[in-house]
Curated annotation (Swiss-Prot):
Catalytic activity: [(1->4)-beta-D-mannuronosyl](n) = [alginate](n)
Species in which this protein is naturally found: Azotobacter vinelandii
Gene3D superfamilies: Serralysin-like metalloprotease, C-terminal (2.150.10.10), Single-stranded right-handed beta-helix, Pectin lyase-like (2.160.20.10)
Activity regulation details: Inhibited by zinc.
Keywords: Alginate biosynthesis, Calcium, Isomerase, Repeat, Secreted
Encoding gene per record: algE2
Top class in the EC scheme: isomerase
Cofactors demanded by this protein: Ca(2+)
Keyword Aminoacyl-tRNA synthetase: no
Hemolysin-type calcium-binding repeat copies, ranges: 388-403, 406-422, 424-439, 557-573, 574-591, 696-711, 713-730, 828-839, 846-862, 864-880
Miscellaneous note of the record: Each enzyme of this family of C5 epimerases introduces its own characteristic sequence distribution of G-blocks in their substrates, explaining the extensive sequence variability of alginates. These alginates of varying composition have different physical properties and are necessary at different stages of the bacterium life cycle.
Function: Converts beta-D-mannuronic acid (M) to alpha-L-guluronic acid (G), producing a polymer with gel-forming capacity, required for the formation of the cyst coat.
Full protein name: Mannuronan C5-epimerase AlgE2
Amino acid sequence: MDYNVKDFGALGDGVSDDTAAIQAAIDAAYAAGGGTVYLPAGEYRVSGGEEPSDGCLTIKSNVHIVGAGMGETVIKLVDGWDQDVTGIVRSAYGEETSNFGMSDLTLDGNRDNTSGKVDGWFNGYIPGEDGADRDVTLERVEIREMSGYGFDPHEQTINLTIRDSVAHDNGLDGFVADFQIGGVFENNVSYNNDRHGFNIVTSTNDFVLSNNVAYGNGGAGLVVQRGSSDVAHPYDILIDGGAYYDNGLEGVQIKMAHDVTLQNAEIYGNGLYGVRVYGAEDVQILDNYIHDNSQNGSYAEILLQSYDDTAGVSGNFYTTTGTWIEGNTIVGSANSTYGIQERDDGTDYSSLYANSVSNVQNGSVRLYGANSVVSDLPGTGQQATLEGTAGNDTLGGSDAHETLLGLDGNDRLNGGAGNDILDGGAGRDNLTGGAGADLFRVSARTDSYRTDSASFNDLITDFDASQDRIDLSALGFTGLGDGYNGTLLLQVSADGSRTYLKSLEADAEGRRFEIALDGNFAGLLGAGNLLFERTAIEGDAGDNALLGTSAAETLLGHAGNDTLDGGAGDDILVGGAGRDSLTGGAGADVFRFDALSDSQRNYDIGDNQGDRIADFAVGEDKLDVSALGFTGLGDGYNGTLALVLNSAGDRTYVKSYENGADGYRFEFSLDGNYLELLGNEDFIFATPSGQQLLEGSAGNDSLQGTAADEVIHGGGGRDTLAGGAGADVFRFSELTDSYRDSASYADLITDFDASEDRIDLSGLGFSGLGNGYGGTLALQVNSAGTRTYLKSFETNAAGERFEIALDGDLSALGGANLILDARTVLAGGDGNDTLSGSSAAEELLGGVGNDSLDGGAGNDILDGGAGRDTLSGGSGSDIFRFGGALDSFRNYASGTNGTDSITDFTPGEDLIDLSVLGYTGLGDGYNGTLAIVLNDAGTKTYLKNRESDAEGNQFEIALEGNHADQLDASDFIFATAAATTGIEVVGGSGTQTDQLA
């Protein structure tokens, strides 16, 4: 319903005070549940209330004030007003107001004929209190001649829109967005204001500024900033399009804010910087035209600097980090120093890609950050890296441009929207780019391959040939062909549902590179979407000095004592023969050795041809020795490499102690002390040969193993699996490999041997045995005792729940039979084995025999098995697991001692896993408990079951050192009381005697 203010006595004659009449129309509309208050063309004079917060006119919920057009309908403050007015039109102070606004009129503050601070439009709730104004719309409104702010939506407001409006000749800012949530400024103009054109301030978030213009303002054209109070910084701000020019300070300033994007704007003719990023994080500056700024002195067109607020309200120092600047055209004025400049104040991690910079005085770019990079090539705008683990990970991206790194394990990567980079790493990975132009990167041939009997290839589920790309440049293939001589064969399945890129040439382990794409891409893949080569910079047989650029390149020194510097970019450096000096420069670089003679030393004759790496970056760079056959770090023997620090502590050597026939052995050095920093993850090693794989299909398969140790993976369908002799692993990589819903699709394992076989569930996220809920699996045996089930009672969205069937009564099945994470397994045989772990998390299985197990660094699991074993966890949080009562026992009657010894147990960090044996706690050694006993010398602590089995054997473990007063239940993984119901404690007589009575 419309309420014409003239019906309430307003005159609009430019003389009379119409405040009361207009307010009466507003109140009437509000009382009726809402409506439109209409002001015909004319000049309506208004005056303020007793307090500044009274304003002149108070707008209310569901009321919209509408005029006849900007300049036609004018609401103007009366001459001579000398008090502050916080809003000529405003919402009520301390009330939550919703669904209101104003359109098609002008507010005039009459600045020349009044005194006091006067604002034009004001709304918002009480600062710091719960509550907010909501759903506010202003369209085609002009605000002029205010001594204070023009548009000032102030404090908590949700869903504000101001569009097609103008603010000019105001004493402070033209447009303010103060603590606005989910709002929009669109197609507005702000000019000739004494301070800023647009000021986005005080915790504003999820806010869009689209196609706005600010010019001729005394301050900046647009500012995004925290403001003067110590509050949460503005974030998730998008500035898209528009123009910011001829302002006194910056064109755009982003200060104490994060996750701000400035794109597609023209910024020019401003007094200081075109754009200034000031104590902000994760700012993107994309595809703008920034030119002819620095009109008032010598400044950069774009400046990145940190902000020192240590003497301010927060007491903090805000470092500018994570700025991404790409695709901008930057042209300097006669005063412009740099196109893009970092200050030397901690500003770092800036990424500059494909910007065109010209006509600047000192240089295109000046960077100080150690981790900042610049490239002439386009980037993909990555603002975050999502990194997996050595296990089977699921990584999901957002709408941003991200890099997803699966690392080891069978990973599932989904980029979401945005231009993403997906690198599955080792393992059989499932890669989905999502929306956007995505890059699928393969970093090693062994990341995706097949053998004669099984497939370990990655699958790309949604490749878009029109915009996605596959980066194979690190693999050495030359292009498409017949699959031989370094080419890849493009092959489509018979039903046209899948396309393969494959090499038909196998490595020494029988592995052939192969990657699969869902869909038929015959005729669609080529130079536009397959990246085979990076630029090669090659030397010759002499002593060469090779220098890379900002692009990703391969530097090949060949023979001679060469000096290689990759510059910026993710480079590959291959020194070749001779004593070479290698510097990767910025970027994630790979230092590759293709032959043992590339870097070698002969200690007998004193000939040192070892290469030297000047700037290895742990966690970013890689050392590629995969072609040489080394399989890990160790003692320098048996295919391992040792780390050795020189006496000065300033150089680390990576060396093999095994000489060739000519007396030379492989060795290179790194400048600096990396002794405690380098791990297997910093190397690309050769993959050791291991168990054979039997791989099923999506159908109902019957897989029969042999006497060898095998990994058996049925895949989809209802499969029958038999391992045969040997220590076999039955692998389930998807919930739907074995499940039931209204019917059973569970796989059946016909010959599971609990003494040596295992079930690999590492890709499914289960934590262990339990009641079938909360990520656990229930262990159930049918009433006839002929079949055992491992089952989850939790269903997926399709109503499917995981279940496996095993022939026989396997009620003694325990954690030792399940692989719940994807750690590397080091397994011994039937003899007396010595197993040594690395810095990674590993599982060491001694098997039969008197074994010596050393976990090394990492959080390891040590299981000595049968025999009298010596167990050393090394550093990390280790688990010493016992899967049978005779794994560690003593027979006092016969004098037989099969007690395992743990050399370095750390209470509070390490754990002893006895959950399979039925023990429920510490005690007197009876009734399912273990007694703690210290020897007379105080040098060894025993854990003892005092109840013998039928042969007189008693379970017992020895721990080096005095732990008698340190051990408690938290150092053990015991069986729960529920789990032991109806189960006899392993190794006990079955007769319970109350020793405490």
